[in-house]
Amino acid sequence: MQADLIIVGAGMVGSTLALALQDTGLTIKLVDGGPLEVQPFKPSDSFEPRVSALSAASQRILQRVGAWQGIVSRRASPYLDMHVWDGSGTGHIDFSAAASHADVLGHIVENRVVQDALLEALKSRGSVELKGNARLEQLQQNDNGWTLTMDDGQQLSAGLIVAADGANSTVRQLAGCETREWDYLHHAIVTSVRCVESNQQAAWQRFTDEGPLAFLPLQREGDAHWCSIVWSVTEAEAQRLMALDDDAFCQALGRAFEYRLG
């Protein structure tokens, strides 16, 4: 069956686009290489390491497509303030929701929570055809648009294709789209830590000579001592830090963060 639109990649971007277009009258298919199943969630679940900072604008989009309630019913951590400073102590800047006459600056949300809420909204409406566990192998352009050949041999056709399949996009590669790439020579260490002090519903970021270190507030069952960290360092330093035991890693992290939260 010829579709009007095929979105390749059911991540946060592809799924949000599918929801935004579901009432346009277009025939839409959303395909992904992984399973398209909503995962069970409990408030006591451990935090996933990958999180996103959702701004007020992102919240409005997710509300309009019907996914926001599914996010907050799972787990979303609002932040009211943001504190940014440099490693030498010569500069800092602060932002606050109060100064912006807003309730919050945004929310820190685990990517899997956003993904499951989007998928839940798609399944509840049923107007977008979902095809999971389907990897793209061939892509051909023809007079009517595009034909996609999947790894199971099935062929899908559409007048328009959206490549939402990530940084290493198969669609982009098969379509021959050129890219300009460079290596920042940095690695990011991401994990969740429980701090001595409350995170104060604030996002914190320190800029060091090696790269930025961010502490993003998380809450689990009312416990506001958790933070998701993103620590950008050189490859060699990342390997050294990852080889440390938990106590030594926490000591190094505390020093790098100037013990702002203990």
Kindly label every feature range from the protein language model.
Residues 22-49:
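Glycine-rich FAD pyrophosphate-binding loop
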Residues 74-174, 182-187:
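Conserved N-terminal helical subregion
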Residues 3-30:
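N-terminal Rossmann-like FAD-binding beta1-loop-alpha1 element of flavoenzymes
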